Amino acid sequence: MRTFEYRVYPNRAQRQQLMACLSESRSIYNEMLAALQAQYEADGTFPSKYDLNMRFKGRGGEHVPATTVQMLSDRLSKALKRALQLKDLGLPVGFPRFKAANRWHSIQLRQYAPSRDVWMDADRKHLHVPAKLGRLLKIKLHRPLVGTPVTAHLVLRADNHWYALIVCETLPQDEQGIVHAEQVACDHPPIGLDVGLKVFLADSEGDTVENPRHYRRGQKRLAHAQRTLCRRKKGSHRRRKVAREVACKHLKIARQRRHHHFTVAKHYAERYSRICVEDLNVVGMARNHHLAKSIHDASWSAFLVILTDKAERAGHGVIRVPARFTTQKCRRCGEHVQKSLSVRTHLCPHCGLVEDRDVHAAKNILQTGLTEVQAGAPPSGTGQDAAPEELRSPRL
């Protein structure tokens, strides 16, 4: 599954219809959650998705399409199921929350097909949606759709612009003309990557990618806007205006970071047959409060997900190796050389090897990854894109 995001341009009347649907769908979702909680408190059971659909049938009125109401029950059921799964794993998790206006930004449309909920017009410049949402929305297809569209979301971002997120079901890789990694291994060399904070990553060929530090670069302007937000009276028009400015700054940082991830991932995914990376416990590493902000700013996990997906589409593979001792172990003699984070050069007292710390770790990762491949371990991968994420806005 792949998700394609396109900008839509509703006129004034259509924007009012979309905002009305957004507000009313949030109210219906909260009513569903209240009914779910009431039944659980009464007899200790949860209503099924079918029960919620039947109970709220026709609740959409003149603002919310019927299929969108059905998707609300599906959304609540998935949230509850995920919460119960995390609880079974012993993780601290709460009950699904009631949604405030600043935590509700999307409208889900169920079926993408002609004469259904949503489909593309023949001119490729307009998107057909239900009449309650404006019927015909202007859209800009800056890139072609790949695969078979299945469903769609209309999302209001923090920049106050509407976007259409079209989820497509892609064909198997072989049917798209993509070959397996074993068939292209002779044409593209393998490589090891070591992600870090001083540099975003270093590879086993000695090259490094600078860490852009998008959040830290924009932190001063963001802090100024947040202080201004704190001085505004809650509920006032001036506070809402500054809150939108803060949200736009966060959105810009997120987009800059994501663009950087895609650029770097594409470079390595297209040029190397096997990409060896560390299997990092990012959650545990972020518990170090001296490094947590920098780790989240680099967003290694998001980068590795993008890298894995792009490598799969190029017919290549990503191999995750244990992160233990990749920095401390000397790649030439195998002895352990203890060093703190402040030591940026690997200097082995046993064999005399001197090398940049990050490049040395990348070469260790490559050696370990190739050893696992020879032992028969398959390359790791995701195979699917994550669901569209909603960016949070400050509380108004």
Model feature map: region roles:
Residues 1-396:
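Nucleic-acid substrate recognition interfaces
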